[in-house]
Amino acid sequence: MSLRFIVGRAGSGKSHSCLEEVRQRLRQNQGESSIILLVPEQATFQYEYMLATTPELKGMIWAQVLSFRRLAFRVLQEMGGAARAHIDDLGKKMVLRRILEQRKSELKVFHRAAKQPGFADSLASALSELKLYRIEPQELQKGIQHMQEAPGSAIRDKLADLSLLYNDLEEFLSGRFTDPDDYLNLLAQRLPGSRTVQGAEIFIDGFTGFTPQEYGVIEQMLGTADRVHVALCFDPMYLQEPCDELEFFYPTVETYHTLLDMAGALRISLEPPIICGKETPVRFQKDSAIAHLEKYYFRHPLQASDAAQGVSLVACANRRAEVEAAAREIIRLCREEELSWRDIVVVLRDLTNYSDLINTIFNDHGIPVFIDEKRNVLHHPLVELIRSALEVITQHWAYDPVFRYLKTDLIPVQRDDVDRLENYVLAHGIRGNRWNDNRDWTYRRQYTLGEDCDIDDNEAEQLAQLNVVRYAAIEHINNFSKKVANCGNVRQITTALFELLESLSVAERMEAWAKEAEVAGRLIEAKEHAQIWDNVILLLDEIVEAMGEQELNLEEYLQVLEAGLESLKLGLIPPGLDQVVVGTLERSRNPNVKAALVLGISDGVLPARPVEEGLFSDYEREALREIGLNLAPGARRKLFDEQYLIYTALTRASSRLWLSYPQADDEGKALMPSPVIQRVKELLPLIQEEILPVEPPCLGGDLAFIANPSRSLSYLAAMLRETVAGRLVDPVWQDVYSWFVQQPQYQESCRRVLAGLYHVNQETSLPPSMGRRLYGSRLRASVSRLERFTTCPFSHFLSHGLKLKERSQFKLAAPDLGQFFHAALKLFAERIKALSLDWGQLSRGQIITITGEIVEELAPQLQNEILLSTARHRYLIKKLRRTLERAVVTLAEHARRGSFRPVAVEIGFGDNAELPAVQLDLADHCQMEMAGRIDRIDSACEGGQHYYSLIDYKSGQPDIKLADIVHGLKLQLLTYLDVALRYSKQLTQQEALPAAMLYFSVRDPFVASTGPMTEEEAEKNLLKQLKMKGLLLADPLVISKMDKELSGQSDLLPVGLKKNGDFYSNSRVITEEQFKLLRNYLEFKLKSIGQQMVSGDIAISPYQRGKEKACRYCIFKSVCQFDPLLEDNLFRLLADQEEQVLWSLIKESLGDKHE
């Protein structure tokens, strides 16, 4: 039995020496003894690979590459102890939650923290640390006794709490479970009797230091194995000289002395150490720059070198540019220096901000990559299935969990069917027991409250298919819901969950997905699918083992399960042999690489800022160390350990070292380089730092950007854009373009790039024949449709030509409220007519009663009872009642002060309507039929002549200007007035003249006041706020029929009358001749718009008038992609002109017709 050290600085050949000796033993070994190569967990694959690929080595059956944990499994399988169920971190946390609940009243320090979420996690970590450092509850009690002289000591009370909880945990685990944190203690106990270790030769490599548990195992090895070889990285000078705590080699020198003392205590013979390396370590014989960094980085005073080759310093615009640059460098190394992918590693201090970027960008560059990190599985379909299935029940079949469940692709329903089902559910607000009440869905979207509810054959067939999909979609989750309803404890719920997974054949689906991914070459994804099922089942088993008989409701069970799923991570080994490995400095173990790219060398990242973690502060750790309770190093020691990580980063590769840092983060905030960068500059002053942008510069471009065809193509597109813009571009991009054009596989991509360069974001007109096919030679149109066309022809094409529309959702929107008020006001007019009541004589009480009845009648009809669906919507009914009441009170005041009375309410014109359609002849034998519905037509008689006042209800605060009519933006009022006058004989048996066209705002406004206000004053203020807007006939007698109390400015109408009978200048009045002129212009404008439609005008041409833009509320922005910065995307500017100019334009447009 002997111990031998293999010592040397980085790159001196320690690992090579270990491997060579193992190979030599394998060549000589005839089975007399086993050979164990003990390395860190993450390095086992690399060492196995290096042994397995040794030329002329016939086999390695007598050699095993193991980590401490794998050695423990091997020995416990041999000696007993491996069969007992083990409990992992999640199980311990669940047990500790229960213990904390039971003991919270007895805790001195943790009694408040015990209730906080996450405390069980911190406690579990603290107890694991105690076990790793071989501190038993008895040692904690001794520590408490040492501190008895310090009354009220927080550390003493903390130890007391930990001792109590530690004891409870051990009592719970005893005889039931094996704690993985105890594996190495068990290994140390069983190891002396193990034939695996007895007489074996053990090589230990790759460690900086060991935990007390690991020291305990090594202690037993020294007394059991034949020979133990330990490779440690430090300068051989420290074999004879003391090492200061501030030295970066201190951790490994401390390890050396600990093992030396251990061997002395055990009286194990020491073999002479093997000292590796010469003046220049073997690894760096070919690269003096890296060798200089290895030797002098931590030495003072500074010793600069004129060496430069082999080390690169790179500053990049941001992290994306940094990873892009790293990808280009890797391709260059493989292409120009003939390295293999496996010869290159990428290392970082922290992968958090880089992992996704590296995965995406390296794949874009065609670089095979393996990122050495535990993979979170929260977004895996299986995990999402489990979480959403439970949430479906806990959230009572809410929309979100139901469709997360259905979109996992683990349900026997096609995704297209799920999408159709989702559209239907969103449109009709289906949730809760409407999913599983066994009644077919027959809900339909109604666009008016009086719509016929009969379902045609096509709709019936679609609903039948939808219900088939629905029943198939909920079959398994419905059964699961019924089972869970009868479950009383954790075991029963978990059993029901497992049966759900079985019924869905999830295990078979995972296997099929794994095979599919493997065939497609997605090896990482294949391994994830292959591992996830077993890991989830193990998690369910552990939950049952730890809490099986505990009674939890489903919400509490879900919390426990989610905690387990969040901690579930997959550890994968590299799926291929030749690939770039990416890892952190702490985990990365690649002993034989030629090039290392160290990314993210920013201030505060490398070295990392120390952070106090766990239940013990640095001060408390030091205090415990003084009484013999040694815990893990605190933040201060970790800061010194960071120096060793810097050393490993700089010495990882043998020939190429590429150091980079980002100058800004993802939000553009500046980042400073690490002091490491400055130190390297000082040691190697001849190295020129490169500053790399996100994209290549136009002139003097770096050829490294032309490294990968797919990425070069995107850069080429940028360069061609610069050329088109008239800027000079490096001629090399012409060569790049020529290369792409000559490659058959890239010709289509080149075509798209060129098309994009000269892309004009504009649509050419449809051929007239296509326009007629699309809209018909007999164009049926509404005024709102024509106004949409005037707003933007392309918007009209999308909505009425292609019939695009927003996804229908079960929510109360402005159109729904408009629909409600139109129906309510119609019903009110019909109700008072049936009761023979006059609008002008209605009392407030009558108004309140009738409006209340109407709201109660209509509320259930709106959108499948949406107003009854939630408390918020039920409150809205009260608001709607108030608004309707206010509208009727205002209209009644109009009637009281005037003579105009309704002659038609909600009257339609068009096919199958009360009034005929308006027929307009267009060119090329086309016709346009105008159809619509008029809210209200009032009539009064003056001097034997009937006059019509046209009223349109709006929910906002609308107004109309002459410019709106001239530009065709607001034609509805004028069109409806024209229809009313056109068919006046059918309404009042004689022709009528226009009196007004007005907007009436249906709303319940607030009254602003700076002081007390009487009810009469408030009513007057409300009338002013609800004053109608529009145009009236400039005839005082006719206007007096609308407001007989008019004196000065009217509070009902947009008009004011002076004492001399003249109108105020702000009065919105026009003459009878002007009304006639507007009606003639209307016909001209309608025909003009209709002709543009059928002619195929679909131009992207939104209007802009001042700050008002057509695109502001357009739902088609993502389709048209209108961009004012593009040369061909210009707003159609509409100028604000004086009314005199506008009347001239109208006359000019009509020519002789206005005479």
Swiss-Prot record:
GO terms for biological process: double-strand break repair via homologous recombination. Keywords: 4Fe-4S, ATP-binding, DNA damage, DNA repair, DNA-binding, Exonuclease, Helicase, Hydrolase, Iron, Iron-sulfur, Metal-binding, Nuclease, Nucleotide-binding. Residues 1-300 form the UvrD-like helicase ATP-binding domain. InterPro entries: ADDB_N, DNA_helicase_suAddB, DNA_helicase_UvrD-like_C, P-loop_NTPase, PDDEXK-like_dom_sf, PDDEXK_AddAB-type. Binds 1 [4Fe-4S] cluster. Its cofactor is Mg(2+); [4Fe-4S] cluster. Its EC number is 3.1.-.-. This is ATP-dependent helicase/deoxyribonuclease subunit B.
